[in-house]
């Protein structure tokens, strides 16, 4: 797909909307606003707003997409340590269950936790099964 910018004035360039843009921001925004009351990420590490990142469940270089359903909130140090290593090496089962239980109860204007889990869990299971 070729993206053609629209030049509305010499100083500005408007690009067509990107349907995937901002999904990382939605998870972060909702967490930082206190609407996702998670204490830990799926690896068992405490979520600190200062060190908050969004992890690709299936890394992009292994076929993962840049979409909400391939993202999870994660401590930035753990995310950097994980890199492209398989997610199952990092998952803490108790924390994963807590992540799911919290997300089941998230319902905001921008994020429906049930809808998120319906898309995210299949990606997580695929990543674990295929060693991604």
Residues of each region from the PLM?
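Generic structural signal for alpha-helix starts
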Residues: 18-26, 48, 59, 108
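A detector for short metal-coordination/catalytic motifs
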Residues: 26, 69-72, 76-132
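Short aromatic/hydrophobic-glycine micro-motifs
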Residues: 36-37, 45, 106, 114
């Amino acid at each position: 797909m070729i993206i053609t910018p629209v030049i509305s004035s010499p100083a500005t360039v408007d690009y067509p909307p990107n349907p995937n843009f901002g999904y990382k921001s939605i998870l972060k925004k909702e967490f930082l606003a206190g609407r996702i009351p998670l204490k830990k990420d799926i690896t068992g590490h405490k979520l600190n707003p200062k060190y908050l990142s969004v992890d690709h469940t299936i890394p992009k270089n292994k076929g993962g997409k840049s979409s909400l359903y391939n993202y999870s909130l994660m401590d930035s140090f753990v995310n950097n340590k994980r890199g492209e290593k398989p997610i199952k090496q990092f998952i803490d089962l108790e924390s994963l269950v807590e992540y799911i239980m919290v997300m089941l109860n998230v319902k905001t204007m921008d994020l429906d936790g049930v809808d998120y889990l319906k898309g995210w869990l299949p990606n997580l299971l695929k990543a674990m099964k295929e060693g991604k």
